[in-house]
Amino acid sequence: DLFRSATNYVTYYEKKTGGSVTFGRWFSEYVSGSVSLFAEEIKYSDPQAGAPQLILNQIGNQTTTGFRLSLTRDTRDYPMDPRTGWRTSGAFSLGTPYLGGTNDFYKYTLDVNKYTPLPFDTRLSVRARYGVVTGLNTNGENKPVPLTELYFVGGINTMRGFVFGKAGPVSTSNTLLGAASELIFNFDYIFTISEEAKLNGDIFFDYGKGFAGDSVSTPLRSAAGLEGRWISPFGPLRAAYGINLDPNEGERKGVFEFTIGQIF
């Protein structure tokens, strides 16, 4: 696979160019795994005035080379709209200068999701995620973790009811800093609105946080709300409104988001 992307994170601008070679296989009916070798060139530019030093330290060009491993066990009855089953996955990434890159880090993430069928064609989804990324010091340079590898907790795919990344570390000026670790719990009570139209409703409660270091501490952040899900001919569509249950000063009390092409 080859890729090229450009993203405006408001505080800085990111351009990525690279490629990967992936080898994958099924070990059984439910278990699959893969290993990827990758190389990417990253350029951070155009920092916002007053951007934190953490961001300013990474402005310029970087190269990441390394590998990624993943292992997944999936027993869900219908992955696009499950009623029952488990999905458990683990992933590990290593960026190393021994393969020619400038970045030096390791990252691992665990993700467990359980679906339980309930009466009247409803179901309960409970999901837990934990991840850590840590910079290494192979050549004594003590390089920071690339911004693109940090966790940004907050938004429709992590903590609904929060603006993207705002359930994790932010600066005194409310600028996203990214997290070195994350712990997230999502509880979803899903009910069918129209089986023919493949339209579902969802009452959710999210509980989690992103952390500046690799240790997890309480209290976590919390949000609750409503979501609509439609398995459309163009792919899954989701629209969610979440309420921040304990907003800090300057935070929004509610956030509406919409996404297409990804299930949760």
Give names to the regions the model predicted.
Residues 1-3, 68-118, 199-201, 226-230:
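Surface-exposed extracellular loop regions of Gram-negative outer-membrane beta-barrel proteins
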Residues 1-82, 86-89, 160-161, 165-180, ...:
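Gram-negative/organellar outer-membrane beta-barrel architecture
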Residues 1-4, 35-41, 86-94, 110, ...:
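Transmembrane beta-barrel strands of outer-membrane/channel proteins
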Residues 7, 42-43, 97-99, 132-138, ...:
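Flexible loop/turn segments at secondary-structure boundaries
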Residues 17-25, 67-73, 107-116, 148-153, ...:
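Feature captures outer-membrane beta-barrel proteins of Gram-negative bacteria and organelles
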Residues 24-30, 76, 117-121, 192-196, ...:
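Outer-membrane beta-barrel channels and translocator barrels
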Residues 120-204, 210-212:
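Extracytoplasmic gating/loop element in the C-terminal half of outer-membrane beta-barrel translocons
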Residues 205-217, 234, 264:
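C-terminal beta-signal and adjacent terminal beta-strands/loops
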